[in-house]
Design a protein with these regions (language model features):
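Amphipathic alpha-helical interaction modules
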Residues: 32-85
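Short terminal alpha-helical segments
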Residues: 1-55, 119, 123
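Amphipathic alpha-helical binding modules
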Residues: 89-144
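Short runs of predominantly hydrophobic/aromatic residues within well-ordered alpha helices
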Residues: 12, 16, 70-74, 111, ...
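Detector for Asparagine
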Residues: 10, 14, 44-47, 54, ...
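C-terminal catalytic/scaffold cores in eukaryotic proteins
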Residues: 13, 27-30, 76, 92-93, ...
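Generic surface-pattern signal
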Residues: 24, 28-31, 58, 62-66, ...
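Charged, low-complexity surface segments at secondary-structure and domain boundaries
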Residues: 2-5, 38, 57-63, 99-104
Length: 144
């Protein structure tokens, strides 16, 4: 049997995704103007966050990710959401080692709920395409 590993777009590096993959556009390390802009939004109000995810995550990733990348991203988050004791707070912590920082004023009060909302958006944007490609992903109402 021959297995081809999925690569990052335009790269030779193997593709992987953590449950926090959708947060990458909101990283503000060394991006003061971006932090100032994002600080206007309340991450605890998903009505405010939805347009940000649509514009800075889905719109960008739809141009570069194929259905297999989308499936890997969704399945990673789905697996975490299905794990009853998964520590979503850990994904939101500032990380000096990787230089991962959110806007200073972003304090997400209900991390699991925040990631459930992200999964819902993923399913809305990518679910049909991923399912039609043969992947088994859970609809949001089965895991939320």
């Amino acid at each position: 049997m021959f297995i081809v590993l999925l690569k990052y777009p335009n790269s030779t590096v193997n593709f992987s995704a953590s449950p926090a993959h959708a947060l990458t556009p909101f990283q503000v390390y060394d991006r003061d103007e971006w932090e100032e802009y994002l600080s206007q939004y309340d991450p605890n109000d998903f009505n405010q966050m939805k347009p940000l995810f649509n514009e800075y995550f889905f719109k960008v990733k739809n141009k570069i990710y194929n259905v297999h990348h989308k499936a890997v991203v969704m399945l990673s988050l789905e697996k975490a959401l299905l794990a009853e004791n998964y520590n979503f707070s850990e994904l939101l912590e500032f990380d000096d080692e990787t230089c991962f920082y959110f806007p200073y004023n972003w304090k997400i009060k209900k991390p699991r709920s925040f990631f459930k909302d992200i999964y819902y958006l993923m399913f809305t944007n990518w679910g049909e395409e991923v399912i039609n490609a043969g992947y088994k992903i859970s609809p949001p109402n089965e895991i939320l």
